[in-house]
């Protein structure tokens, strides 16, 4: 999908609108490409408290605090059915891959997973101290 505007230029304009006394800034980078999310993390390192990637529904294992004090993860994951493909019933998704025909996806049933992160931020500086992935399975 082609963006309406370059997110790397746009984020600078949006950050400039935030009052200078605001120290804790959270950015949700909703994108398909992991490389774009990683580049945004580096671009914003030291300028924001947190960059969390979303969209793919698959939690990544690369959470860390970057050198400038920005907590980062490429994709936090999702909250939804565990035994499916990104929350959808696996049979329909597999059939679409196997026959290359459009198919309506149905939400999977069963156990629920919740992926999230716990981030500790110094409120006086806005720098992250830590980021921890948390994954829960709910029956």
Identify the meaning behind each predicted range.
Residues 1-24:
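Binuclear metal-dependent hydrolase catalytic cores centered on His/Asp/Glu-rich metal-binding motifs
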Residues 20-29, 47-51:
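Short beta-strand/loop segments at the ligand-binding rim of alpha/beta enzyme cores
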Residues 29-31, 135:
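Short, structured patches in soluble enzyme cores that scaffold and shape functional sites
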Residues 34-107:
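Conserved beta-sheet core of the metallophosphoesterase superfamily
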């Amino acid at each position: 999908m082609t963006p309406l505007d370059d997110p790397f230029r746009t984020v600078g304009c949006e950050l400039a609108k935030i009052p200078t006394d605001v120290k804790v800034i959270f950015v949700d980078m909703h994108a398909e490409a992991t490389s774009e999310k990683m580049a945004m993390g580096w671009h914003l390192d030291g300028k924001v408290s947190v960059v969390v990637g979303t969209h793919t529904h698959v939690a990544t294992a690369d959470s860390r605090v970057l050198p400038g004090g920005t907590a980062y993860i490429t994709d936090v994951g999702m909250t939804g059915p565990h035994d499916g493909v990104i929350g959808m019933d696996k049979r329909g998704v597999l059939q679409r891959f196997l026959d290359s025909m459009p198919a309506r996806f149905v939400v999977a049933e069963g156990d629920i997973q919740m992926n999230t992160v716990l981030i500790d931020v110094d409120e006086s500086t806005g720098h992250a101290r830590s980021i921890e992935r948390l994954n829960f399975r709910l029956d």
